Swiss-Prot record:
UniProt family annotation: Belongs to the pyrokinin family.
Residue positions, PTM Leucine amide: 9
Gene Ontology cellular component terms for the protein in this record: extracellular region
Keywords: Amidation, Neuropeptide, Secreted
Any single biological process term in GO: neuropeptide signaling pathway
UniProt KW Transmembrane helix keyword: no
Entry function: Mediates visceral muscle contractile activity (myotropic activity).
Compartments where located: Secreted
Lineage: Eukaryota, Metazoa, Ecdysozoa, Arthropoda, Hexapoda
UniProt protein name: Pyrokinin-1
Length: 9
């Protein structure tokens, strides 16, 4: 899940 900084699941 992208919290707005790093694109991660």
């Amino acid at each position: 899940h992208t919290a707005g900084f790093i694109p991660r699941l």
